[in-house]
């Protein structure tokens, strides 16, 4: 069955688009080839659902809301610059096990929760069935060792929608530069809870940010991985409505412990 699914994905030239999930890139630009070698495409069967980050040859980090009931169909593509085209640099791996953060509220996945929602702890580790081969196009990135600095210019990347209201995903991996803002900016913008395990990132004037399909992808601030795309405004990149990211410095112990206990 897995061979059949992989064959179908390859015969289609890569990957199908899935219905919108939660987050995407607006106002960005095509990333330079292989400039984000840790960026991963996370799939369910042959449907693209989220981004992810390679932390180790055996481990990918993504968002917990990318979780699906049938985890046996989770798989990833690494080393891709073009989502829907075959590339010599690309590597395919199945996911052997998923580890959503134990404190993430999984009932949020039903999308029938009264406001305000608390989307804290939105991260998930994926154990690969076979280690990734490290190449120029596939490289892990380290976890942060200190707090990010307010005002930093950060880089988000993803294959999420490039239009704010209509779900239109690009072939080329997109990058966007956005600012790390005080969490108060996001707390004022949303009815959902903004907690100390989240980062508020975007442009106060709007027009740039993440959107549907970018969920689980990396946020790099001053060259360091500091966040995972989590949630934001609808339509995306509205003025005074920055994006919200999982703050990884708060979760390094859980990430390292989970990886160590599941070699």
UniProtKB/Swiss-Prot annotation:
Gene3D superfamilies annotated for this entry? Trypsin-like serine proteases
Record's keyword terms, sorted: Disulfide bond, Glycoprotein, Hydrolase, Protease, Serine protease, Signal, Zymogen
Coiled coil region boundaries: none
Keyword Protease carried by entry: yes
Q: Which residues form the signal peptide?
A: 1-17
Q: How is its activity regulated?
A: Strongly inhibited by protease inhibitors diisopropyl fluorophosphate, phenylmethanesulfonyl fluoride and SBTI.
Q: Does the keyword Transmembrane apply?
A: no
Q: Which InterPro entries match?
A: Peptidase_S1_PA (IPR009003), Peptidase_S1_PA_chymotrypsin (IPR043504), Peptidase_S1A (IPR001314), Trypsin_dom (IPR001254), TRYPSIN_HIS (IPR018114), TRYPSIN_SER (IPR033116)
Q: Enumerate the active-site residues.
A: 65 (charge relay system), 122 (charge relay system), 215 (charge relay system)
Q: Which residues form the propeptide?
A: 18-24
Instruction: Write down the top EC class of this protein.
Output: hydrolase
Cystine bridges: 31-175, 50-66, 154-221, 186-200, 211-236
Query: What PANTHER family has UniProt attached to this entry?
Result: KALLIKREIN-1, KALLIKREIN-RELATED
Quote the protein name from its UniProt record: Kallikrein 1-related peptidase b27
- The organism is Mus musculus
What is the phylogenetic placement of the source species in the record? Eukaryota, Metazoa, Chordata, Craniata, Vertebrata
Q: Which gene encodes it?
A: Klk1b27
């Amino acid at each position: 069955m897995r061979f059949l699914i992989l064959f179908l994905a390859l015969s289609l030239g890569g990957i199908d688009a899935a219905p919108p999930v939660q987050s995407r890139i607006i106002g960005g630009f095509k990333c330079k080839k292989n400039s984000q070698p840790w960026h991963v495409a996370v799939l369910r069967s042959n449907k693209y659902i989220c981004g992810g980050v390679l932390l180790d040859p055996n481990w990918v980090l993504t968002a917990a809301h990318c979780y699906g009931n049938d985890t046996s169909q989770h798989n990833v593509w690494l080393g891709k610059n073009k989502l829907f085209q075959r590339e010599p640099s690309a590597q395919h791996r199945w996911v052997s096990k998923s580890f959503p953060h134990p404190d993430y509220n999984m009932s949020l996945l039903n999308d029938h929760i009264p406001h305000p929602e608390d989307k804290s702890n939105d991260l998930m580790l994926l154990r690969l069935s076979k280690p990734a081969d490290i190449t120029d196009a596939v490289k892990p990135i380290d976890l942060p060792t200190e707090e990010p600095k307010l005002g930093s210019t950060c880089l988000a990347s993803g294959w999420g929608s490039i239009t704010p209201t209509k779900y239109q995903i690009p072939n080329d991996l997109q990058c966007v530069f956005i600012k790390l803002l005080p969490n108060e900016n996001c707390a004022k913008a949303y009815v959902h809870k903004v907690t100390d395990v989240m980062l508020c990132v975007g442009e106060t004037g709007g027009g740039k940010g993440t959107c549907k399909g970018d969920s689980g992808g990396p946020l790099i601030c001053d060259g360091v991985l500091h966040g995972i795309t989590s949630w934001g405004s609808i339509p995306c990149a509205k003025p005074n409505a920055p994006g919200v990211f999982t703050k990884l410095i708060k979760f390094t112990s859980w990430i390292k412990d989970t990886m160590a206990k599941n070699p």
